[in-house]
Amino acid sequence: MTLVLSMNRFCEPIVSEGAAEIAGYQTLWEADSYGGASPPGPAPVPSQGDRGASSHLAGSHYRGIPNPISTPKVTYFKRKYAEDEDLHPPLSSCSHKTISIFEERAHILYMSLEKLRFIDDPEVYLRRSVLINNLMKRIHGEIVMQNSWCLPACSLGGTPAQEWFLAQDCPYRKRPRVAKEEWEKIHTCCFYQECGGHCLNLPLSVNTSVGSTSAAAVASAASSSSSPSTSSSSSPSSSSSPSPSPSSSSSSSSSSPLPLPSCSHHVDFDIGSAPIYKSQIPASEIFVTNIRSLGVQEKVKFNNDGKVSHETSRDGDALGQEPVGNDLDFECKGQFYDYFETGYNERNRVSESWKKSLRKKELSPSSKLCCNRGGKM
């Protein structure tokens, strides 16, 4: 006796397990059992879910999964679920075991401490490192100071050298450094006067080569100019002036090695001669004779008793009294006076108040100058 069991339970789709997958497996099993022949009855039309499942199964063997037709159902389900688990690994496997930054720094410090323990004398090592650090700081500071000290192009034509160096701000240098070529570009003589504290730039230097000849010419000119002044002067104080004036001029010219301007004689100027600096002559011997016009010259003479006598002469009288060889001297004197009166090359303009103060200082009898000593009494 045999027991026949119905197969309806296996063929009916179960909704809880997924009807699409079971229907797909049933069609594949039926096709395999019939050996490629068409199954009896009308072929069921696969739904949209069946198409997706069949396409998924058809392309599964390209990923290393064997064809599900030749494999049992249990093996296929196991591999399918195992493949899904491989695609999503656990998060615990993603975190690598690495040392944190703080632990790494602590390890480095510990190793450096172990190295320091093997040094013979730690104090010597520390002292050496401090010295090296200080030396590097000094070298860096020296480089910064050298870069900050920039000497511009030497254009000292308008300003004197002393004022130019005082105007420069050099906090890193005790002494300013100037190249030799820049010192050679300075051609003007700077003289600081006591009157007003102004700086006078002389474009023409004093001739030192012909000191003896110019002194003799000055003495002769002074003697010739003093002889007619006695007859023309009306005041009694000027009648006693001709006798001591040649002696005072000769003594002053003989005492000073250079023909410098003083109360009773003039100066010869030459362009190609050597300059005279402040240390060679006293500042009180250089004075400016202000001229109200180019044709009139004023000469101030001082007697032994301290009285002042003024003499005024025209250009014709001066040229007639002086020798013929002193024409260049007179032209140079005119350039000298014109330089102080109008300014050389329109750069050094003197204010009118300073001119008036100079005139008052020269004409007032209170400021007495000594020709022999070259100073104020």
Curated annotation (Swiss-Prot):
Region described as Disordered = 36-66, 221-259, 306-325
Cellular component annotations (GO), alphabetically ordered: nucleus
Which InterPro entries has this protein been placed in?
SERTA_dom, SERTAD4
Origin, by domain of life?
A: Eukaryota
Q: Which Pfam families match?
A: SERTA (PF06031)
Query: Where are stretches of biased composition, namely Basic and acidic residues?
Result: 306-317
Q: Where is the composition biased (Low complexity)?
A: 221-257
Tissue occurrence: Highly expressed in adult epidermal tissues and in digits.
Q: Which residues form the SERTA domain?
A: 101-147
What is this protein's record name? SERTA domain-containing protein 4
